[in-house]
């Protein structure tokens, strides 16, 4: 018959494993890549009809998943999961030697933390139309900013001839194709197995944080890059008593960029 000690440990491990179904039900990121490629192609074609057609465009998406679970004396106390996604759009007007980035490092109005990013819906299956609408809307905004700053750059160029930086604004690179499979939720089970080897957990507190940032990049030259940036953090603290009654605390922290390590 299982002891109370073992039951507490099982509840803690079960809570951590169960979090995978909250945090990573299924990665549908392959569909997102297809949406980005299709929208980029369509928007580039449509903007070629404008007075100032772009010569280069790219989309960058940062898709963040994070989870946190904490337990005390084997009982689950807190668990949470977050998922957010942002799009950064770049539109270049002119040519590689002179474009809207000439006098603007960001090529458009930046936010406090750099170039402005816009939120994207996180449901690839149920909100595909909303994702496409958000991409289209942001591309239109970036294009308008690009035209404004390109015209400003032309005006400044006309009065600064001979005194401005001659370096090109853009250097084309070779086309890259790189794809990483979505990070498997099975990793959580493997990571949580560490608790099976440490009985001290049932006498104290444990916290587990898991984070995956999945990045997408596509451009009009044909580059496609999809990669994962994961990390795991486990904090364990416990207290035991020596034979003489003295309390002996123990705190351990485990961190890894790659949870396999």
Description of each model-found segment:
Residues 15-23:
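Bacterial N-terminal signal peptides
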Residues 27-261:
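Active-site bordering "gate/hinge" segments
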């Amino acid at each position: 018959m299982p002891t109370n000690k073992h039951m507490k440990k099982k509840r803690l491990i079960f809570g951590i494993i169960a979090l995978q179904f909250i945090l990573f039900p299924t990665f549908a990121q392959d569909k997102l890549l297809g949406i980005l490629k299709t929208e980029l192609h369509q928007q580039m074609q449509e903007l070629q009809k404008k007075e100032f057609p772009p010569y280069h465009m790219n989309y960058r998406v940062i898709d963040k998943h994070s989870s946190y679970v904490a337990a005390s004396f084997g009982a689950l106390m807190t668990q949470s999961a977050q998922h957010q996604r942002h799009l950064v759009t770049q539109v270049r007007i002119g040519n590689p030697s002179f474009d809207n980035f000439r006098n603007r490092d960001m090529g458009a109005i930046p936010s406090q933390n750099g170039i402005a990013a816009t939120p994207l819906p996180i449901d690839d299956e149920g909100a595909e139309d909303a994702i496409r609408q958000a991409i289209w809307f942001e591309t239109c905004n970036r294009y308008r900013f690009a035209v404004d700053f390109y015209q400003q750059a032309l005006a400044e160029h006309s009065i600064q001839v001979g005194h401005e930086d001659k370096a090109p604004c853009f250097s084309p690179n070779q086309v890259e194709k790189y794809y990483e499979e979505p990070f498997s939720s099975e990793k959580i089970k493997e990571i949580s197995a560490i608790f099976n080897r440490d009985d001290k957990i049932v006498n104290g507190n444990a916290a587990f944080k898991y984070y995956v940032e999945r990045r997408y990049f596509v451009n009009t030259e044909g580059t496609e890059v999809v990669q994962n940036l994961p990390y795991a953090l486990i904090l364990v603290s416990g207290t035991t008593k020596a034979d003489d009654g003295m309390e002996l605390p123990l705190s351990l922290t485990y961190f890894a960029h790659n949870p396999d390590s």
